[in-house]
Amino acid sequence: MYKNAKVIFITPDNNLEKLRETAFRDKKTVVMTNYGITRGFFLIRPESIPEGKEEVASLLDGVSRYWKHQTLEQLKESVGHIDMLVTGASAITPSGIRFGKGHGYFDLEWAMLYTMGIVDGTSVIVGAGHDCQVADVDVTVEEYDTAIDY
């Protein structure tokens, strides 16, 4: 999945800093938002990050030096399709339902990207966490809940 992905959406979770750094080193194009989606979507192309600055760029304060704000229309034109999406989670059921993080921002991000045709059923969704965060509990699933694939 990751190896073949050219464009990856990575949520601004602190636990995903190393993933962002690795993606920049691996020359992946990264799409992200800020916390709360208050400033919309941002595109970070690998060539915009000077060699050796990948770690700084992976931090929320650092990435703002290299990202380019994108409307959804611009994002569709710039990247076309997002191959992989990665989000953090407080907990995940074995069936891929995230819970405990609150606010539903990832569900909203997915819905906006899906409506624009930037993500679809072939876009892989990964929940990043530790094995101890997988909880076999009954969770009420809402129609707008976006399940993870892995």
Can you say where each PLM-predicted feature lies in the sequence?
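N-terminal targeting/leader regions
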Residues: 1-10, 17-19
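Surface-exposed, charge/polar-rich loops and edge strands
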Residues: 1-6, 26-29, 37-150
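General beta-strand structural signal in soluble alpha/beta enzymes
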Residues: 10, 32-33
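Small/polar loops that bind or transfer phosphate-bearing groups
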Residues: 11-12, 101
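Short beta->alpha connector loops
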Residues: 12-16, 132-133
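Alpha-helix N-cap/helix-start and coil->helix boundary motif
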Residues: 16-17, 106
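N-terminal functional module of multi-domain proteins
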Residues: 18, 33-35
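A short acidic, amphipathic alpha-helical/loop segment
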Residues: 18-23, 140
